[in-house]
Amino acid sequence: INDYWDNPQLKWKEDASKAMQHLDVAGYNYMWYEYENDHQKDPLRIIYGSETVAQEAAVNWNLVEKHPYIIGDFVWTALDYLGEAGIGHTLELSKGEKNPQFMGWPWYNAWCGDIDICGEKKPQSYYRDIIWKEREITMAVQPLPAVGKTEDVSYWGWKNESLSWNWKGLEGKPVKVNVYSRAPKVRLYLNNELLGEQEVSKKDYTATFMVNYQPGELKAVATYDSSESSCAILRTTGAPVQIRLIADRKVIKADRDDLAYVTVELIDKEGRVVPDADMKVTLSVVGNGIIRGSGNACPTDMESFRSLSPKTFKGKAMAILQPDGNVGEITLNVSAEGMKGASITIRTVDR
């Protein structure tokens, strides 16, 4: 149940129980701050967060861990989706500017998911790994807004940060490094030089450093009683020199209802994805299938999903292959100006 957005005459404290009494388990949309209050009134009520947002992941999960009557929460959303355009946007605003709930053209997807529409984890998904104790430490880098502006994150959004240490043009200028961990303290190193150590907030499991950007290696280390534990590393890549193709499956059914999803990556000479490489690639296919779709995760890229020349976003794009119904092979060829192309073959079998 949401707060009564469309029925302002109703009040949560007086009216919510009238609805909750009909439920075996009470779902609260974004209303985590009422969990404990309502438990005092109805100690037998079992509660879960039926919709929660990434910015409130820590407070929601802390309550789950604290109280046995709160059994978990559902994330809005796990995966980006088409529609509710830009509900998860972040803008740089001048004083007095208002941040709209939705965004107009060319925004087309919601951009509020922990995972993008190509299936890649976004920074908030790595942050949630910390909340859920799936990893010990991670970090992301947040460029500062332009002079005279402030970053304004929509309620369903996330700060403008990336798991990248490629910030060409910001050499010598400050960037914000957000380190996420449940360790009591974290240390930050740049090119093997210790920049500092900070306590991690127990409220949101975050420690923030201001760092003057220099290319190289940025390393965050979880520490316990001065003893270093796990680390997270971001490295500056070289320029993109070739394409790498990765298929979710190399063998699929010779059936028009089956699909193969191929990730297109722009990599440097050391095989690392170049996270700031946004450029067009050319797709072609031979054999027993067609290119059913293509695209990237950018929420404002209006290129057709049927395009044979999609653009990469953060160094990646996707091509979707569909069999023609016959047993055989589908070979996808991908090229881009100034770099070595790549091919991948998917077998189609009768099974």
Model-found features: residue ranges?
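Short aromatic-acidic-glycine turn motif
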Residues: 241-245, 283-300
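Substrate-binding clefts and catalytic carboxylate motifs of secreted carbohydrate-active enzymes
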Residues: 1-257, 269-273
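Solvent-exposed serine/threonine-rich low-complexity stretches and specific carbohydrate-binding patches
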Residues: 193-202, 292-309
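Short beta-strand elements
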Residues: 231-238, 340-351
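Short, solvent-exposed loop/turn segments enriched in Ser/Thr/Gly
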Residues: 256-262, 328
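Extended low-complexity, serine/threonine- and proline-enriched intrinsically disordered segments
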Residues: 185-193, 278-292
